[in-house]
Structures are given as C-alpha cells and as structure tokens.
Amino acid sequence: MSRVTRVILIDLLVERSEFGHGGNQEVIQPIAERSAVEVLLVTPQMQSEEAGLRAQEQGLVGISENDVPNWDYEYPFWEECRMEMHGNEVVFRRIAMPLHGDDEMTRDWVRSIGPDAVVCSGSRRNVTMWEEWMSGGGSLMRCSSRMGIPTLGICFGHQLLCHSLGASVERAE
C-alpha cells in the first residue's frame, strides 16, 4: 500500500467555490500525481474557540457545522469530501485547529497531526488589518516552517507567513 501524503490547508476562501474548494483542488493536484492525499482543512476565521481548545487537547478533531459559528453560507458546509485525482484518492476533511497563537502549544499540536506540508490559501483579508484568528494561523505557519515542514503561503498566505516570521508587511499605496 502506498503512503498517504497529509497536508494541512488553511482554507480562507471557503465561501467562494471557484477559489475555495476549486482552488484547494488545484493546489493539491500536483501532490496527488505521486500519492493519495489527506487534506486537513482548517478555517480559523470561522471556527469557535471551543473547537480550538478540543483540538489542542485531543489532536486531530473533526468539526461539525456547530463548530463554525461564523460560517458563510454562500458555500454549503460539509465535513468530508472524497475524490480521485490522477488515479489516487484525495480526502478533504475539515478539522479544528488551536486558535491561541502560542507557539509551544502549536508545535505540540502540529507534531500530533504529523503533516507532510502546510499550505495557506489566499483570503479577502490582509495582515495590515489584523484580526484575532490570524494569531493562530500565523503560529501554525511559523511553527511548521521552523519544524522543517514544507510551508507554502499563497497571496494572503504569503503575507501571513512573512509576518509570522518577523517581516514587515505593508499595503501598497
């Protein structure tokens, strides 16, 4: 049996099917050429603090609709989606992530999940207009990159990764 590649994907455009789930599929396609993929989708911008606490305590915690009180219903909620890409199974599964932004605790959580890569999508937001949930996302990206886990930021994800590693990110005039 071949190995399954595990990717944590910070899904910040979930409410836009063409950029959210469609974009996630585009990001995962090259990985799926080589192996089956388990994509663990986290949505810190929509998730409850309680779900984050459960994730910190228990590790891999699936979420239900009750755990995402800020869900944008322009796109329907689902817990899991399976498909085939390049002859390999790809499973997209929504999970909770810690929101606290504490790096030591985030490292423990990342170790318990054991991802092969971490990806942060684009977003309608930017880091120059900071929101509380960005602390948890930034901690995840900072910790994964410092742990030697391949970490990719796309658009906003690039801003968040740079900011979390200490770079100055400014909005262009």
PLM region descriptions:
Residues M1-S139, R146:
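N-terminal beta1-alpha1 cap of cysteine-dependent amidohydrolase-like domains
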Residues S121, L152-I154:
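Active-site neighborhood of phospho(di)ester-bond hydrolases with catalytic His/Asp-centered motifs
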Residues C143, L160-L161:
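Hydrophobic/aromatic ligand-binding patch that stacks against planar heteroaromatic rings
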Residues P150-L152, S168:
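Proline-centered loop/turn at the N-terminus of a beta-strand
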Residues F156-H158, L165:
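Active-site loop->helix "elbow" adjoining a glycine-rich segment at hydrolase catalytic centers
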Residues H163-E173:
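A conserved active-site-flanking secondary-structure segment within enzyme catalytic domains
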